[in-house]
Amino acid sequence: MTDLIPLEQAHCLPRKGSDHKLGEARLAELLPQVPGWELAEAGMALTRTFRFADYYHTLAFVNALAWIAHREDHHPDLGVHYDRVVVRYSTHDVGGLSENDFICAAKTARLYDQGITA
């Protein structure tokens, strides 16, 4: 689906059932497209830690990320700390990772890279 356009420009689609769970080959194709992200939990989740100067910038990022999650209707698990946010994506309805996780990971990284919260 997202091979024709960059992940950060794609939009999430409803995904339910194990048919949409990504296999190892597809994970290996998509992971290089989201630098800095790591597979976690035996390939069941995608995680990355984002660092900030202070709590204000941390929360500004979280609020901007909440807008992306709402727009895409795909919501990460967040660990919010004073100077960092741990973002974890997984698609519960497929029992692992779907393309939606990689789309949102790319959008999250773009938000951070643009320095919107700086």
Swiss-Prot record:
Keyword field: Lyase
Superkingdom of this protein's organism: Bacteria
Annotated Pfam families: Pterin_4a
EC number: 4.2.1.96
Assigned protein family: Belongs to the pterin-4-alpha-carbinolamine dehydratase family.
InterPro entries, A to Z: PCD_sf (IPR036428), Pterin_deHydtase (IPR001533)
Coiled coil start-end: none
Record GO biological process: tetrahydrobiopterin biosynthetic process
Catalytic activity from the UniProt record: (4aS,6R)-4a-hydroxy-L-erythro-5,6,7,8-tetrahydrobiopterin = (6R)-L-erythro-6,7-dihydrobiopterin + H2O
PANTHER family the record matches: PTERIN-4-ALPHA-CARBINOLAMINE DEHYDRATASE
Organism: Xanthomonas oryzae pv. oryzae (strain KACC10331 / KXO85)
Name used for this protein in its record: Putative pterin-4-alpha-carbinolamine dehydratase
Family annotation (NCBIfam families): PRK00823.1-4 (NF002019)
GO molecular function: 4-alpha-hydroxytetrahydrobiopterin dehydratase activity
